[in-house]
């Protein structure tokens, strides 16, 4: 039965139609034009096959956020904390009582602009991603016909400042640190381990015979002082080569120790935390060495730089750093490989100069002379 619009005794206009299951649906309007417009939209959606039960779309953002979070049980605790924080601080205060169907694209554009006033581009992007993922799930669940967050402009990110130390600068920094933290920073600078990966190392992860350190675990700091031990960031355990000079130092450091204890610990003991190591040991050493500003993550940058300078290709650097793909390595450290391309051209030039030198000087070819 086709839908229809009829005027009720109370003066309201009632629009009626039957959904895909044959159930009658109705809504009342004060104006006939609004009733006809709504009915036409429902019938069009039914014809396209993307009709949504209006009752399902009336669930609030707060209610739906719990459904969405339940689908994220696989997340690392630290990532889940970030999602929950975005919901608690930004999403729910603004949208918690709003029905999914009442959110508009324009509303989201204004909301993102408001967040940017107080928060960084990275934080704003993350908050928008949380909202967009919730709406995307609602579309897949048949509660919305489209994700109104699609097309909302994300703030442009600024890359963290990269800093590449020379071999001499690494030595200067290490000289300002007490044992074994001098060994720690040199290990970071020549293996590219993330700080959490270094904190997760056990003595048995160091293979002195092969000159490898195996990254099996990573330690993440949670809010309120919590810690979480998990597989490395890409969930891929990896063996990272260690330069011979560093193997010698590690041999002296681990000899006589059982395999199970952490390779590095806090003082006077316990798990090594970046939140303690950086302000109490690393930052003062950086100042004394005259290398400020510098962060522990810059030692990872340094490892990439030293590897490329030694002739390592992008695939080798990717495996060393534990990136998900070589394209990610190129994206993060494109400048390093630009310099490598210059070196390739110079080496090709040196190899070809003897054979093609006269041609390169403009000598031309016999065939070209005959043609003239």
Regions from the language model: what does each represent?
Residues 1, 175, 210, 219-246, ...:
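C-terminal secondary-structure termini that scaffold catalytic or DNA-interacting sites
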Residues 2-58, 233:
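Short, surface-exposed polybasic/aromatic micro-patch for ligand or macromolecular engagement
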Residues 11, 121-129, 140-201, 209, ...:
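Basic, Lys/Arg- and aromatic-enriched nucleic-acid-binding interface segment
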Residues 15, 108, 131, 135, ...:
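Short, basic/aromatic-rich helical patch in the C-terminal catalytic core of site-specific tyrosine
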Residues 19, 24-30, 57-62, 67-148, ...:
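N-terminal core-binding DNA-recognition domain of tyrosine site-specific recombinases/integrases
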Residues 32, 156, 164, 219, ...:
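Catalytic-site neighborhood detector that most strongly recognizes the C-terminal catalytic loop/helix
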Residues 53-60, 101, 146, 157, ...:
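Major-groove DNA-contacting interfaces characterized by cationic-aromatic clusters
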Residues 118-121, 172-182, 191, 240, ...:
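Short, basic (Lys/Arg/His-rich) helix/loop patches that form interaction surfaces
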């Amino acid at each position: 039965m086709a839908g229809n619009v009829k005027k009720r005794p109370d003066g309201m206009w009632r629009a009626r139609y039957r959904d895909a299951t044959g159930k009658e649906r109705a809504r009342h309007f004060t104006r006939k034009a609004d009733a006809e417009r709504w009915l036409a939209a429902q019938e069009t959606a039914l014809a396209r096959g993307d009709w949504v039960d209006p009752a399902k779309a009336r669930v609030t953002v707060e209610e739906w956020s719990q459904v969405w979070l339940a689908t994220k049980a696989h997340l690392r605790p630290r990532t889940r904390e970030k999602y929950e924080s975005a919901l608690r601080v930004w999403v729910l205060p603004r949208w918690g009582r709003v029905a999914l169907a009442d959110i508009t694209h324009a509303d989201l554009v204004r909301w993102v602009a408001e967040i940017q006033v107080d928060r960084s581009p990275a934080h704003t992007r993350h908050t928008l991603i949380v909202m967009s993922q919730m709406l995307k799930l609602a579309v897949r669940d048949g509660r919305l016909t489209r994700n109104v967050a699609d097309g909302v402009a994300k703030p442009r990110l600024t890359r963290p400042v990269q800093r590449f130390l020379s071999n001499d600068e690494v030595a200067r920094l290490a000289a300002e640190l007490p044992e074994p933290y001098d060994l720690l920073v040199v290990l970071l600078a020549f293996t590219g381990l993330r700080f959490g990966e270094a904190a997760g190392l056990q003595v048995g992860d160091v293979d002195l015979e092969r000159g490898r350190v195996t990254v099996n675990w990573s330690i993440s700091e949670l809010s309120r002082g919590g810690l979480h031990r998990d597989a490395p960031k890409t969930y891929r355990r990896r063996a990272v080569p260690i330069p011979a000079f560093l193997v010698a130092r590690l041999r002296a450091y681990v000899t006589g120790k059982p395999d199970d204890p952490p390779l590095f610990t806090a003082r006077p003991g316990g798990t090594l935390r970046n939140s303690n190591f950086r302000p109490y040991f690393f930052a003062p050493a950086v100042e004394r060495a005259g290398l400020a500003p510098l962060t522990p993550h810059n030692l990872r940058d340094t490892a990439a730089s030293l590897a490329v300078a030694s002739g390592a290709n992008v695939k080798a650097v990717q495996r060393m750093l534990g990136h998900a793909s070589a394209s990610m390595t190129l994206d993060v450290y494109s400048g390093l490989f630009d310099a490598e391309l210059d070196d390739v051209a110079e080496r090709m030039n040196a190899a070809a100069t003897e054979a093609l030198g006269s041609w390169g000087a403009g000598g031309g070819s016999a065939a070209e002379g005959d043609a003239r």
